[in-house]
Amino acid sequence: MDLSEPIHDFLLVFLGSGLILGGLGVVLLPNPIYSAFSLGLVLVCTSLFYILSNSYFVAAAQLLIYVGAINVLIIFAVMFMNGSEYYKDFHLWTVGDGITSMVCISLFISLITTISDTSWYGIIWTTRSNQIIEQDFISNSQQIGIHLSTDFFLPFELISIILLVALIGAIAVARQ
């Protein structure tokens, strides 16, 4: 989007605060339904970040796949859970929980200082390939692959990191 720098910065702060509040809601809210709705807020804010960085295809895929399908599936799964079983295993924090929270808080503070010291306006998030590709001989799926590996490389890698974190979290939850 071609926005002026103050509007761009305001939208970054607004969406960033939406991401932080939604992420805190996912982790801290005791009701799983509210946590699932907070996850929806996080996914929508992430999609709006992609729109802000001119990655419209990735934003549409984020909205359709994650918000439209995965988050709705999570909400339905949480609605069918028995709520009384969820609160049986409540225990106080252990030493490992405290160490983990301190590591997470220090990582969060270092990320916030790095993000606040960086000028995000005018950064080119996509790269263009120097090769000329004849559009007549390439199918739509090949064009999507070419765009994902050239034009939208950084957003594609960021989504893969998000998926890896979600997979590790799902394995950790399934083990319990």
Swiss-Prot record:
Keywords: Chloroplast, Membrane, NAD, NADP, Plastid, Plastoquinone, Quinone, Thylakoid, Translocase, Transmembrane, Transmembrane helix, Transport. It is a multi-pass membrane protein. GO terms for cellular component: chloroplast thylakoid membrane. One of its GO terms (molecular function) is quinone binding. The chain crosses the membrane at residues 10-30, 32-52, 61-81, 92-112, 152-172. InterPro entries: NAD(P)H-Q_Oxidoreduct_6 (IPR050290), NADH_UbQ/plastoQ_OxRdtase_su6 (IPR001457), Nuo/plastoQ_OxRdtase_6_NuoJ (IPR042106). Its main location: plastid. Gene3D superfamilies: NADH-ubiquinone/plastoquinone oxidoreductase chain 6, subunit NuoJ. Its EC number is 7.1.1.-. Pfam families: Oxidored_q3 (PF00499). It is found in: Plastid, Chloroplast thylakoid membrane. It catalyses: a plastoquinone + NADH + (n+1) H(+)(in) = a plastoquinol + NAD(+) + n H(+)(out); a plastoquinone + NADPH + (n+1) H(+)(in) = a plastoquinol + NADP(+) + n H(+)(out). Belongs to the complex I subunit 6 family. NDH shuttles electrons from NAD(P)H:plastoquinone, via FMN and iron-sulfur (Fe-S) centers, to quinones in the photosynthetic chain and possibly in a chloroplast respiratory chain. The immediate electron acceptor for the enzyme in this species is believed to be plastoquinone. Couples the redox reaction to proton translocation, and thus conserves the redox energy in a proton gradient. NDH is composed of at least 16 different subunits, 5 of which are encoded in the nucleus. This is NAD(P)H-quinone oxidoreductase subunit 6, chloroplastic. It comes from Nicotiana tabacum. The lineage of its organism: Eukaryota, Viridiplantae, Streptophyta, Embryophyta, Tracheophyta. The gene is ndhG.
